[in-house]
């Protein structure tokens, strides 16, 4: 029973504090309406005082909530006063237009000052937004207001003969010195050069890798051709020697003729020799060969073959046979 009574007392204290809070809020609202009759300094003080009071009440409320926290499980089975659980926190909002207008009149520019000095533009129509919670619509309204204000300001500045655009030949001194910008330029050039060199090195590595692949493929192709050529030669040898050839060893006649033409005597050497210039040949036939003449009267292979001492002439000359022993003895006597 003692626990239930303590819980009831706590709940009653909480309800009493909430009632005191509502009473203070009503008093602050009544005090804000009476600000119109006060002077300017009193108005400012009245603006500050409710804020301080609300801060104090908020601190007191936080302290009271911290000290008198009651769990929901403890309040079960207790009959509270009517509307005790409907107490909610409410922020105090003050919109004292009279004080704000008085302050504005005090700090605003005088009417006789020129537009060039203050450059203050006030829109003719207020901003009207259907849904103030829509961020896009709100920002669009601010943008339109700014554009219209800038256009109005440009018109007033043109009337006052004030230049509002930069000339085409305007030379603006840079914030950084020339030495600093030269260092920046050198650094940018260095970075660009390093990037270019890295790209070139990467490209060379790729080409080298591709070149190795091509070289290996070429070597494999040469080995395969060499193997095929040796097989063809062996088959041709067996064919010419009269060896037994099976159907598996046969190959096309065109292939054998091609291999025979390939291995003709002197066929490779004639192709590899450089051919004489036809223009040079014509001149040699017309004017003769302009080379050395000191051996022009010496015999060569063709001239020697034309005589009896040539290879053909010597073949016709038969050597005398050696006489027999009886003839040799007879000749000695």
Curated annotation (Swiss-Prot):
Feature: compositional bias, Acidic residues: 56-75
Ranges in coiled-coil conformation: 212-240
Residue numbers of Phosphoserine PTMs: 272
GO cellular component: nuclear periphery; nucleolus; nucleus; preribosome; preribosome, large subunit precursor
A Pfam family recorded for this sequence: Ebp2
Bias kind Basic residues: ranges: 312-333
Listed Basic and acidic residues bias regions: 19-29, 218-227
Keywords: Coiled coil, Nucleus, Phosphoprotein, Ribosome biogenesis
Gene Ontology BP terms: ribosomal large subunit biogenesis; rRNA processing
UniProt key word Cytoplasm: no
Presence of the UniProt keyword Phosphoprotein in the record: yes
Region of interest (Disordered), ranges: 1-75, 203-227, 261-333
PANTHER family the record matches: RRNA PROCESSING PROTEIN EBNA1-BINDING PROTEIN-RELATED, RRNA-PROCESSING PROTEIN EBP2-RELATED
Record's subunit section: Interacts with sad1.
Entry function: Required for the processing of the 27S pre-rRNA.
Annotated family: Belongs to the EBP2 family.
Name recorded for this polypeptide: Probable rRNA-processing protein ebp2
Origin species: Schizosaccharomyces pombe (strain 972 / ATCC 24843)
């Amino acid at each position: 029973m003692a626990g239930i009574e303590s819980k009831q007392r706590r709940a009653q204290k909480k309800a009493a504090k909430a009632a005191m809070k509502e009473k203070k809020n009503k008093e602050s609202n009544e005090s804000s309406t009476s600000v119109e009759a006060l002077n300017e300094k009193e108005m400012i003080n009245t603006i500050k005082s409710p804020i301080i009071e609300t801060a104090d009440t908020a601190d007191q409320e936080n302290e009271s909530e911290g000290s008198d926290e009651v769990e929901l499980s403890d309040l079960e089975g207790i009959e509270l006063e009517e509307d005790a659980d409907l107490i909610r926190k409410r922020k105090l909002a003050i919109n004292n237009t009279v004080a704000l207008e008085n302050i504005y009149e005090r700090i605003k520019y005088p009417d006789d000052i020129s537009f060039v000095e203050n450059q203050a533009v006030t829109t003719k129509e207020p901003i009207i937004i259907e849904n103030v919670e829509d961020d896009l619509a709100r920002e669009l309204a601010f943008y339109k207001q700014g554009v219209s204000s800038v256009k109005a300001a440009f018109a007033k500045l043109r009337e006052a003969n004030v230049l509002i655009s930069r000339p085409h030949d305007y030379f603006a001194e840079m914030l950084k010195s020339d030495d600093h910008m030269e260092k920046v330029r050198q650094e940018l050039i260095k970075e660009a050069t390093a990037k270019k060199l890295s790209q070139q090195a990467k490209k060379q590595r790729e080409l080298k890798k591709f070149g190795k692949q091509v070289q290996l493929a070429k070597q494999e192709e040469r080995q395969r051709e060499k193997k095929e050529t040796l097989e063809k030669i062996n088959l041709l040898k067996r064919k010419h020697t009269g060896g037994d050839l099976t159907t598996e060893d046969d190959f096309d006649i065109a292939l054998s003729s091609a291999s025979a033409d390939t291995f003709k005597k002197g066929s490779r050497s004639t192709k590899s020799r450089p051919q004489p210039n036809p223009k040079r040949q014509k001149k040699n036939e017309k004017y003769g060969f302009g080379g050395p003449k000191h051996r022009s009267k010496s015999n060569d292979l063709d001239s020697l073959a034309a005589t009896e001492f040539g290879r053909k002439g010597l073949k016709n000359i038969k050597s005398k046979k050696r006489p027999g022993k009886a003839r040799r003895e007879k000749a000695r006597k």
